[in-house]
């Protein structure tokens, strides 16, 4: 396979990869917005705590996710334009965006590996605090906040390790509400669903980012060295030259 064929294949591959990266960035931004502004996480974040541990994690995840989605989309756009226009400067900028995205993704993966339950613990601690305060003073605003949380997660109270509702929680879980799931388990199920989606997006982003960086590096060197790519220039017609009694046909030459 010649050098020109390899470059043509690399161009097609990077265009396809950039399209997938754009879709991935859009999916990531959508997931971040849903998590940040969704009802399940908003009611937990707005709990009346002096220092809500989950609220900090929620804003951190939002800004990191939006920044990552923006970098991925920008890298895909720059490298696509660079591929079409054969601009090594734009290709280098696209490679830089992918490299920054890769660094962020690695940090997120390490954080997820070493702190697998940090978000879950923060959410459950917030619910436990609201629940305990509501049980201590049923006539306070804590009871209303607890009711909003339980209506959002479609759950009621929390069960003891033996599978029974605690005595104070049995008061509020009567009638149709008694058929609802334990709130601790319901919260875990919601978090696990979002964890699964986030893990899939993270792993896919890592794979596509590494592949995009490899293609960007290859095409940058190809464009920079002008090997196999069409040289851009203009053609002009030279006047006929006489060599003795022989005449030469007009010829074309390229100059850059």
UniProtKB/Swiss-Prot annotation:
CDD domains: PHEMX_like_LEL. It holds the Pfam family Tetraspanin. Belongs to the tetraspanin (TM4SF) family. It is a multi-pass membrane protein. Coiled coil: none annotated. It comes from the Eukaryota. Expressed exclusively in hematopoietic tissues. Expression detected in spleen, thymus, bone marrow and peripheral blood leukocytes but not in heart, brain, lung, liver, kidney or testis. GO terms for cellular component: cell surface; integrin alphaIIb-beta3 complex. One of its GO terms (biological process) is negative regulation of myeloid dendritic cell activation. This is Tetraspanin-32. It is found in: Membrane. The chain crosses the membrane at residues 15-35, 61-81, 90-110, 203-223. Keywords: Membrane, Transmembrane, Transmembrane helix.
């Amino acid at each position: 396979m010649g050098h020109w064929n390899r470059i043509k294949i690399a161009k097609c591959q990077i265009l396809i990869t950039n399209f997938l990266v754009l879709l991935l960035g859009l999916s990531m931004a959508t997931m971040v917005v849903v998590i940040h502004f969704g009802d399940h996480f908003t009611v937990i974040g707005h709990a009346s705590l002096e220092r809500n541990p989950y609220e900090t994690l929620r804003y951190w995840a939002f800004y990191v996710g939006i920044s990552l989605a923006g970098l991925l989309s920008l890298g895909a756009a720059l490298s696509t334009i660079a591929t079409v226009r054969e601009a090594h400067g734009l290709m280098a900028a696209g490679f830089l965006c992918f490299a920054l995205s890769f660094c962020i993704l690695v940090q997120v993966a390490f954080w997820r590996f070493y702190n697998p339950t940090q978000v879950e613990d923060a959410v459950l601690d917030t619910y436990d605090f609201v629940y305990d305060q509501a049980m201590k003073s049923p006539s306070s605003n804590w009871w209303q906040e607890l009711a909003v949380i339980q209506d959002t997660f479609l759950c009621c109270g929390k069960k003891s390790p033996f599978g029974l509702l605690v005595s104070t929680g049995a008061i509020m879980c009567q009638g149709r509400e008694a058929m609802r799931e334990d709130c601790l388990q319901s919260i875990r199920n919601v978090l696990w669903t979002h964890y699964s989606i986030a893990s899939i997006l993270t792993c896919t982003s890592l794979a596509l980012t590494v592949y995009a960086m490899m293609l960007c590096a290859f095409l940058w060197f190809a464009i920079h060295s002008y090997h196999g790519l069409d040289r851009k220039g203009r053609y002009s017609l030279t006047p006929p030259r006489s060599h003795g009694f022989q005449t030469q046909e007009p010829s074309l030459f390229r100059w850059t």
